[in-house]
Amino acid sequence: MKILKKILTITAITIVVIIILRNNYSMATDINTNYCQKLPVRVALFAKDLNDDYLVFLRNKFEDIQKNNEGKVVFTFYDAKFNKSVQNADIDKKLKEGIDLILLDIVDINNLGETISKITQYNVPVIVFNREPSTADVIKPYKKVLLVGADSKQAGILQGKMITEAWNSHKESIDKNKDNVLQYIMLIGEKSNETSIDRSKYSISTIQQAGIKTQELASPVLNWDTETAKSTVDALFLRYSDKIEAIISNDDSMAIGAVQALQKYGYNTGNKSKVIPVVGIDGVPEAIDLISKGFMLGTALQNPNIADVMYDIGMNLVYDRNPVEGTSYKLDETGVAVRIPFTEYTGPMFEYKIK
């Protein structure tokens, strides 16, 4: 009888302990969940250059997202000004202060693996954007790291198609020396950069595949900068003058600088007899304005909702969901990247209708 009482007592105590522990665990879980829901998600965007037209565009979009999601998310923005040491110091400081999501436009793409490794030690998810490594293997080892990027090959192809359409429809205006060869200047964003390489390669190969002979006059590396492009194209115009028949730029920032330089000499101001087709990539507001006025031929338009896509994917990473859950996008063949397609945008430079 005494043994039975002991067994019953021990059993009762065990049950009570289990119930208490379970209740405490449930309370802790509820507290943690509510805590996460009450706190706004802290997002830090680290940019190579916040004055870049595309980054200005993205920053405005993210600020709109914050306004429309008050209390849910807070964005902070850090400008490395092309300085790797500054960016590394900013990241280190923010990791120690506490952060929930990092959007990374890295200064030195060769430093990406080391930077991601450091960030993931804090269990902070990362979205890499605007610049990408030559191989996805740098990203693959990390569960909470994703690349959100565009298809640079497609962007180059669209540029080539726009130039081809212009040449085929208005060759008499473009082929100034009547040699049946398209003389062009290629404005390069960065040397040894995969995005620059693909955009340059596929724009020209598309033109050549259409049966158009080409000759490159110059291919300066301009670091994606408007003012550098303006001064460089100014100098190239003085050197080549009427030989320049098209300018193909790796992005809109440099294309804008090219248009500004040409306008100094009376080109691309609306006079149909003095036109040099200029194409860019991204679809930033200033480029769209130049295109709509007929001062720039066109651009490969980045999806204007890309900030929303990055936000949705980022929130999925923060809350341990499938990164593309609730979006219309899917991971590419690497399993660690989402590709946002470009669309062609042209204006009335040669009386085109805006597409």
Regions found by a protein language model. Give the residues of each.
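Flexible loop/hinge segments that line or gate small-molecule binding clefts
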Residues: S117-Q154, D179-N180, V284-L290
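Structural motif
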Residues: V74-D100, A218-Y240
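Hydrophobic alpha-helical segments within soluble ligand-binding/sensing domains
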Residues: L147-N180, A229, G283-A287, N303-R321
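Short, solvent-exposed amphipathic alpha-helices that sit
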Residues: Y54-N68, A155-Q159, E194-K213, T232, ...
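Short, low-complexity disordered leader/linker segments with a strong preference
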Residues: M1-V41, S117, Q121-Y122, K353-I354
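Hinge/cleft segment of the Venus flytrap/periplasmic-binding protein
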Residues: R22-L39, N180-K191, N303-K355
